[in-house]
């Protein structure tokens, strides 16, 4: 009888996890061409040959109401996965993101003697820090995108490996600004500002008016300023268009459909909501200002829970305020415009900022897929 192939269990719960999982499978195939991959997968992981017991869509729920409605089904799936992985006894189990689902599953499997990895650290360094103890009990290794995440886990003696960020691998150290401008129809000599008011309905509602009023002030300072606004989907575009007509109908703004990365590369500066967009903007080598608002009660709660001095990833990576953050009441058109003006006009300030962006990019550009694969192999061979 032939020996059983190396078997790796994987669970991904959303599109970003499906992308990471597919990259991990590709990298592992380079070392283990006969390996078997089973679990919960999206279309990209299945295209790499993974056997899906459940489709990823089963786990992809958003919002409290939907989670409550789907909770019995989610709990049944987790119990079934626990049973099936326990019976199969994979050589290693990898939970990809979706921490509320996967970390509990990892803990159950680890108690049954199955080695486990959690791929993508939750933001325990920022809030709900006591989760680190549950993670430590549940996993044999955490794979972290960012170096300060590993430093946090080290403080609690929880095994963690910094593998770099897949987004940093995907983007050039020296983006082609001329090509991006040509693709978007922006003149090489024009000043260009990108506005990115977020991907969520609530973000576009809270930020768009202030962002547009800031852009109006900058247009007065820099006549002919090109203003581009990439929007993530038709719903956000329609929402933004409604606000534009109400707030700044005369402002010459060009709306783009889901071309955020090209807009960042093409722009001289960007005004954006916090989140992964700030990291992507740094990797695009585009100077930025971060503006963010939320409902007062939510902000008050966040201030009590969040333990970091900054919210944007460039600042967290640099360990200082590299990028201006204007949050809540500070997120006013006058302040936003004042922070953006030197980024559009001061070549020395821009050059210093871009040099730092490039340095930080190099720091997290580590071939994350391959690093993750090697971490999995190390655990299998331990």
Swiss-Prot record:
UniProt entry tagged with the keyword Transferase: yes
The protein's Enzyme Commission number: 2.4.1.182
GO biological process: lipid A biosynthetic process
A GO molecular function held by the record: lipid-A-disaccharide synthase activity
Listed InterPro entries: Glyco_trans_19
Pathway(s) the chain acts in: Glycolipid biosynthesis; lipid IV(A) biosynthesis; lipid IV(A) from (3R)-3-hydroxytetradecanoyl-[acyl-carrier-protein] and UDP-N-acetyl-alpha-D-glucosamine: step 5/6
Organism domain of life: Bacteria
UniProt-listed SUPFAM superfamilies: UDP-Glycosyltransferase/glycogen phosphorylase
Keywords: Glycosyltransferase, Lipid A biosynthesis, Lipid biosynthesis, Lipid metabolism, Transferase
Record's GO cellular component terms: membrane
Catalytic activity line of the entry: 2-N,3-O-bis[(3R)-3-hydroxytetradecanoyl]-alpha-D-glucosaminyl 1-phosphate + UDP-2-N,3-O-bis[(3R)-3-hydroxytetradecanoyl]-alpha-D-glucosamine = lipid A disaccharide (E. coli) + UDP + H(+); a lipid X + a UDP-2-N,3-O-bis[(3R)-3-hydroxyacyl]-alpha-D-glucosamine = a lipid A disaccharide + UDP + H(+)
Enzyme class label: transferase
Family: Belongs to the LpxB family.
HAMAP family named in the record: LpxB
Function: Condensation of UDP-2,3-diacylglucosamine and 2,3-diacylglucosamine-1-phosphate to form lipid A disaccharide, a precursor of lipid A, a phosphorylated glycolipid that anchors the lipopolysaccharide to the outer membrane of the cell.
Name of this protein: Lipid-A-disaccharide synthase
Organism ancestry: Bacteria, Pseudomonadati, Pseudomonadota, Gammaproteobacteria, Enterobacterales
């Amino acid at each position: 009888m032939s020996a059983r192939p190396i078997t790796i269990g994987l669970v991904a719960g959303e599109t970003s996890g499906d992308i990471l999982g597919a990259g991990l499978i590709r990298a592992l195939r380079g070392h283990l061409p006969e390996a078997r991959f089973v679990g919960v997968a999206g279309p990209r992981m299945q295209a790499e040959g993974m056997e899906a017991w459940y489709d990823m869509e089963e786990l992809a729920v958003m919002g409290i109401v939907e989670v409550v409605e789907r909770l019995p089904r989610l709990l049944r799936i987790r119990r079934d996965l626990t049973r099936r992985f326990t019976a199969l006894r994979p050589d290693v189990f990898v939970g990809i993101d979706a921490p509320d689902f996967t970390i509990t599953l990892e803990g159950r499997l680890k108690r049954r003697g199955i080695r486990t990895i959690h791929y993508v650290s939750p933001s325990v360094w920022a809030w709900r820090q006591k989760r680190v103890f549950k993670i430590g009990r549940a996993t044999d290794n955490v794979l972290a995108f960012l170096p300060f995440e590993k430093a946090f886990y080290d403080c609690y003696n929880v095994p963690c490996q910094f593998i770099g960020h897949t987004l940093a691998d995907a983007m050039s150290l020296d983006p082609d600004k001329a090509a991006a401008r040509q693709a978007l129809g922006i003149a090489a000599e024009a000043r260009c500002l990108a506005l990115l008011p977020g991907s969520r309905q609530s973000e576009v509602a809270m930020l768009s008016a202030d962002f547009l009023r800031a852009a109006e002030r900058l247009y007065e300072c820099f006549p002919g300023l090109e203003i581009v606004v990439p929007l993530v989907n038709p719903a956000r575009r329609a929402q933004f268009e409604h606000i534009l007509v109400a707030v700044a109908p005369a402002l010459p703004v060009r709306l783009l459909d889901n071309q955020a990365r090209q807009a960042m590369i093409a722009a001289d500066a960007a005004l954006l909501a916090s989140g992964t967009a700030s990291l992507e903007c740094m990797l695009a080598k585009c100077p930025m200002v971060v503006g963010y608002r939320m409902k007062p009660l939510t902000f008050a709660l966040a201030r009590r829970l969040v333990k970091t001095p900054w919210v944007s990833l460039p600042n967290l990576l640099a360990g200082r305020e590299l990028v201006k953050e204007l949050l809540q009441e500070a997120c006013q058109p006058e302040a936003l415009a004042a922070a953006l003006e030197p980024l559009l006009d001061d070549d020395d300030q821009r050059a210093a900022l871009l040099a730092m962006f490039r340095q930080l990019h190099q720091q997290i550009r580590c071939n994350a897929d391959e690093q993750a694969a090697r971490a999995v192999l190390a655990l299998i061979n331990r």
